[in-house]
């Protein structure tokens, strides 16, 4: 299998530490969400940013492959850190809230959203491992 892209991130100090990527594009302090001070991020925010960007890229690609123009997709991804009744440690769940402009029917938009969910590498990586709420809004 050919690798299309590879990146590395290094963390020192865990949830009360620092993380940076090998190219230094990300170079931030990390704190638990409960201790957020506005100057640090947390793993959940980083996951939300990556997943939202990846999913929206997949959604935009699927729309373009189906010759849908001017839909201007927007994706907001909510990551929740929840109690896990089956384990001592918490678990993640996500809500993917997508918006597209009213240039296609709700039915077609939902099909393309589902196609994006099948295509997105983050969705593939998490499929069957976390709860995902997939929501769509067609706006004027």
Curated annotation (Swiss-Prot):
Signal peptide: none annotated. GO terms for biological process: response to oxidative stress. Transmembrane segments: none annotated. Gene3D superfamilies: 2.20.25.10, 3.30.300.20. It comes from the Bacteria. NCBIfam families: organ_hyd_perox. Belongs to the OsmC/Ohr family. This is Organic hydroperoxide resistance protein-like. The lineage of its organism: Bacteria, Bacillati, Bacillota, Bacilli, Bacillales.
């Amino acid at each position: 299998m050919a690798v299309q892209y590879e990146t590395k991130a290094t963390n020192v100090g865990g949830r009360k530490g620092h993380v940076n990527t090998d190219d230094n594009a990300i170079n931030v302090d990390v704190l638990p969400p409960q201790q957020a001070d506005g100057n640090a991020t947390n793993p959940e925010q980083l996951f939300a940013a990556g997943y939202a960007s990846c999913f929206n890229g997949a959604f935009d690609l699927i729309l373009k492959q189906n010759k849908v123009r001017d839909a201007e997709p927007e994706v907001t991804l909510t990551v929740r850190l929840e109690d896990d009744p089956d384990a001592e440690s918490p678990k993640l769940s996500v809500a993917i809230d997508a918006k597209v402009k009213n240039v296609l029917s709700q039915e077609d938009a939902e099909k393309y959203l589902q196609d994006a969910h099948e295509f997105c590498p983050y969705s593939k990586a998490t499929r069957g491992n976390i709860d995902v709420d997939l929501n769509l809004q067609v706006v004027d």
